[in-house]
Amino acid sequence: SSRLLLSYSEFEKSLDFFQTIQRLSFDTNAYNQFEILRHQFRRLGTRDLRIAAIALSLNATVITRNAKDFGQIKNLSIEDWSSD
């Protein structure tokens, strides 16, 4: 049906879009950063700490509205784009 064809068309557009985005891996450097952070920030969530670890290992900036948690991590660059 035309609805099914439209769905596949939209799916293909989504795949094309996501292929243009660079994925950041949780590699050995990120894992080492994560282990340090995990011991320093026991109250922060594992996923947030993994995101922070990847960013620190790549010297990257985290775009987030969660400045309360991410802001606790020294040397982590964060930006909040939601307030503009």
Which residue stretches match the model-derived regions?
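Acidic, PIN/NYN-like endoribonuclease modules and their adjacent C-terminal/linker elements
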Residues: 52, 56-84
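PIN-domain endoribonuclease scaffold, especially VapC-family toxins
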Residues: 1-53, 83-84
